[in-house]
Amino acid sequence: MDQTYMKEKPILPLLLSMALPMVISMFVNSLYNIIDSIFVAKISEDAMTALSLVYPVQNLINSIAVGFGVGINAVIAMFLGAGKTKEADKTATQGLFLNVIHGILLTIVGLMIMPSFLAMFTNDQTVIGMGLQYSTIVLMFSTIIMASISFEKIFQAVGNMVITMLSLMTGCIVNIILDPLLIFGIGFFPKLGIQGAALATGIGQSSTLILYLIVYVLRPIHVKIRKDYLKLEAVCVKRLYAIGIPATLNMALPSFLVSALNAILASFSQTYVVVLGVYYKLQTFLYLTANGMIQGMRPIMSYNYGAKESARVRKIYLMTFEIVVGIMAVGTVICFVMPQTLMSMFTNNPETLTEGAIALHIICAGFIASSVSVVSAGAFEALGKGIQSFLISFLRYVVVIIPAAFVLSKTVGVHGVWHAFWIAEIITAVIAFILYYQLIGKSGKN
């Protein structure tokens, strides 16, 4: 397969052809938690609270899978750009193997710590019980998630975005169909409640992996997974973790943030914990759409970086940034105009609806500013500059927002937590802008 179109095709058509399937994929993929939440909300408010408390753990699993997958994706694309197919094959093989090991370890550790983790945020035994029921099943599918996302990043690295889109859509459709059947016991299906939501998600994710395997066997791609390369090589492992660890931390930081904010909000009322949980369900539509553009950008940028096309790398960044700003602008308008309508998808509690609308009004003020941070972090990952990418995310999710939320909650009240979001986005955007001109901008000029 000829990969030279990555550096020859006009940037906008190339970016859209790579990114649009990923935008659709990420939009559909975000439905996993959204659909679970919509149906779980019909069980009880306690069930919705349990789901909100388990969300950081789900996000952590996904973060490790995707973060290390970013390393797989970037290294493969760089080797393909440099014409080193054998090294690309080694990266794919050893990257997949390592991510499967990650999944096994996560399952074991997760099952051990979940009771203590949930007890940190609530004394309600009903909520803890539901959280354990849901998280136990979710954790059992960790290895499948790791393998599935590894294949996703391998297919993306060779530019095969359509298969990724179809695989993710298949898993989501299976999840949507099974959710009501397993939660409420429709027909001959057992009534499993919140456990049914977790099982439906796991089966959906398994369907995605099965489709990847079928396509890989029947329609071979440019990169091969070979048993001869299963023996880990220090150089290959170092390359993968050099990008994968910062990328994983980038994606895991939101889990840490949600847990920290849950602790602050729980001191006021469980209502605010639910509001935060619903907000993160809603914002996945917005940020995963933007992330779809970035996933389309990443292999193109990595390939051109490997091919020494530095001026083209800079143009790819700017084009992606303009599109993401547009996405964030639309999200800002929607959240400002119809916040209660959005919240009502997940709850009919009047207090939750009112407080949720206030939260969305305040938080959406930082959406457009976040474009700088989001695109810059993705670009740095594509160029193998994991430390810079991690610095942006660390500022955005820890250094600014958590202290600001704590201080403002004490001085302004609970609404101060929501103001901490846009404050963090603006400060981080300024720093990301400076890093861009120091590194990517300078590289493009040279």
What residue ranges belong to the model's regions?
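Short alpha-helical transmembrane segments in multi-pass integral membrane proteins
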Residues: 1-19, 76-143, 189-245, 301-366, ...
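Short runs within selected transmembrane alpha-helices of multi-pass transporters and secretion channels
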Residues: 69, 138-156, 164-172, 197-210, ...
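Helix-terminus/linker motif at the lipid-water interface of multi-pass membrane proteins
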Residues: 27, 31-49, 118-125, 181-192, ...
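Residue-level signal for short hydrophobic patches within transmembrane helices
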Residues: 8, 12-31, 35, 57-64, ...
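Small-residue-rich hydrophobic transmembrane alpha-helices
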Residues: 48-108, 145-164, 262, 275-339, ...
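Hydrophobic transmembrane alpha-helices of multi-pass small-molecule transporters
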Residues: 60-63, 107, 175-180, 209-213, ...
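Structural signal for membrane-spanning alpha-helices in multi-pass inner-membrane proteins
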Residues: 110, 153, 179, 183, ...
